[in-house]
């Protein structure tokens, strides 16, 4: 895909290929820039942009990303122009209410699913901004900043929701009933304030339903990734210090590749740790990492692989 955003001629040195694995081309945000990073680690294109918690690429090559606290926009990549937008802070009956959007998803029918924190609901809208469906969310500790993190509509029409403030992943059916939920354990440790490796909690960020029916969960400030069965048994875990020379901090995005590997976001981890890590789950071998702190800072919370088809995320 050819982009005509500002061309960045500087080449990053902050990337690594471990063993024989190739690097990845991906989109990300950090240091007030939305950027595409090449497989060689160079910034191919960039544009000024604030923080994000979610990003998608549409079949037409456009990007869908959040702008500000509550607006979702579609960006035409040839010139970086916004060609469509929906503002949950002003539309859908939300004007005057505290609203934050941390997750959304383009749907196969052309509509968009949006998780609205504050109102505590999932909405599906058409491209005219008309609400087609509303799913109320169960939130034990409501707050517009923490009601949700990543939310995904599954192939069966259910919704898999990370409730950051509750420390719980809930699955809702198409009628809004909770059909499964999993409380992220504290593993016998006390909560600790902060965002980096020294913090601790259960503020889940992402959940991916695997082909085997299990759920892969990034536990945010729990510094780990866990695989949980429908019966709520943990059958696999990647802990904070399992990867040699790498410390996991606020574990964010999860991308499950067709080859079975996991690409994991490692936010707030400091300059001594990579911001993205690709891991073989069976061996816990690191096959690729991106050390993006110098270029994108300590708050690179979301990324999107652009060079691999069929990724679950």
Question: Which residues make up each language-model segment?
Answer:
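Bacterial N-terminal signal peptides
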Residues: 4-16
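Histidine-/acidic-rich catalytic cores in large beta-rich domains
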Residues: 20-313
């Amino acid at each position: 895909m050819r982009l005509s955003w500002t061309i960045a001629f500087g080449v990053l040195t902050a990337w690594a290929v471990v063993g024989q694995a190739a690097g990845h081309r991906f989109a990300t945000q950090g240091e007030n820039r939305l950027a595409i990073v090449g497989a060689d680690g160079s910034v191919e294109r960039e544009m000024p942009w604030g923080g994000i918690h979610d990003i998608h690429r549409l079949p037409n090559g456009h990007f869908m990303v959040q702008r500000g606290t509550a607006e979702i926009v579609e960006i035409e990549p040839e010139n970086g122009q916004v060609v469509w937008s929906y503002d949950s802070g002003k539309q859908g009956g939300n004007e005057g209410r505290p609203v934050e959007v941390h997750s959304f998803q383009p749907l196969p029918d052309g509509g968009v699913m949006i998780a609205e924190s504050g109102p505590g609901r999932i909405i599906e809208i058409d491209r005219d901004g008309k609400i087609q469906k509303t799913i109320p969310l169960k939130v034990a500790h409501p707050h517009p900043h923490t009601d949700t993190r990543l939310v995904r509509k599954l192939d069966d029409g259910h919704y898999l929701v990370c409730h950051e403030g509750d420390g719980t992943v809930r699955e809702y059916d198409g009628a809004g009933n909770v059909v499964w939920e999993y409380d992220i354990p504290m593993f016998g440790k006390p909560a600790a304030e902060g965002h980096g490796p020294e913090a601790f909690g259960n503020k889940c960020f992402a959940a991916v339903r695997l082909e085997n029916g299990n759920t892969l969960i990034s536990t945010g400030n729990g510094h780990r990734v866990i695989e949980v069965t429908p019966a709520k048994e943990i059958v696999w875990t990647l802990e904070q210090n399992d990867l040699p020379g790498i410390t996991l901090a606020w574990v964010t995005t999860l991308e499950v590749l067709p080859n079975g590997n996991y690409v994991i976001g490692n936010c707030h981890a400091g300059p001594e740790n990579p911001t993205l890590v690709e891991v073989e789950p069976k061996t816990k071998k690191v096959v690729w990492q991106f050390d993006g702190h110098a270029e994108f800072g300590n708050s690179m919370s979301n990324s999107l692989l652009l060079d691999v088809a069929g990724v679950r995320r």
